[in-house]
Design a protein with these regions (language model features):
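Gram-positive cell-envelope targeting signals
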Residues: 1-51
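Surface-exposed, hydrophilic segments of mature proteins
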Residues: 29-204
Length: 204
């Protein structure tokens, strides 16, 4: 009898795990790590992002537009504070030298609920020292002025502007909402191939 109960329990547990996997898979593509936290830290260093909107001359914290999953809601209306063209960000780094990258995933949701991932290229302007590799892996890598890929800065500008002229809004239909995940992560120097799964830096 005990054996039968245990077997039944195993079947129930497997079913629950399968259900969770199905539900979670619709959102799994939207994160580059198992955690939705914006910060990634190790004992020897810590990195984080300061995300805000530049409304004219006023710097407005983006926290007001951040949901429980760490995603920022962006507006397509130029008159709104959280217009995607107003998005700005800095990256902070503390501790030992590290290789740093920022992963950016955009979620476009149509009026009928259909979700498209990174459907429209968003032409942010990145500060000097950053390499835009989003076409390949949705990430922007810190290259540094010497292209060494080693970050020793305390605070570095990341998103500094938006190229309105090259933004193709023709594919955007009425009722679309946009959210973005900005996730900073870092690895010890010389360990990025194992952790990030790349043989060399994208600019090499």
């Amino acid at each position: 009898m005990l054996h039968k109960l245990n077997k039944k329990a195993v079947v129930i547990i497997v079913a629950i795990v399968a259900l969770v996997a199905v539900v979670g898979s619709s959102f799994a593509w939207f994160v580059s790590r198992t955690s939705l936290l914006q910060n990634f830290s190790l004992s020897s260093f810590e990195v984080s992002a300061d995300v805000y909107f530049l409304d004219g001359e006023e710097k407005v914290s983006a926290d007001e537009y951040k949901d429980e999953n760490g995603l920022y809601t962006l507006s397509l209306n130029k008159d709104d504070v959280n217009y995607l063209g107003n998005l700005r960000a800095n990256v902070a780094h503390r501790g030992a030298k590290a290789c740093v990258r920022v992963t950016m995933n955009h979620q476009w949701t149509l009026a009928d609920g259909t979700v498209a991932q990174n459907a429209v290229a968003v032409p942010y302007v990145f500060a000097n020292g950053w390499f835009d590799n989003r076409d390949a892996d949705y990430s922007v890598y810190y290259a540094g002025e010497d292209n060494s890929g080693e970050a020793s800065f305390r605070t570095a500008e990341f998103i500094t502007g938006f190229d309105e002229k090259s933004f193709d809004a023709s594919a955007i239909v009425e009722g679309v909402t946009l959210k973005v995940l900005i996730q900073v992560d870092a690895v010890q120097v010389n360990r990025y191939p194992q952790v990030w799964g790349i043989e060399k830096f994208p600019w090499e």
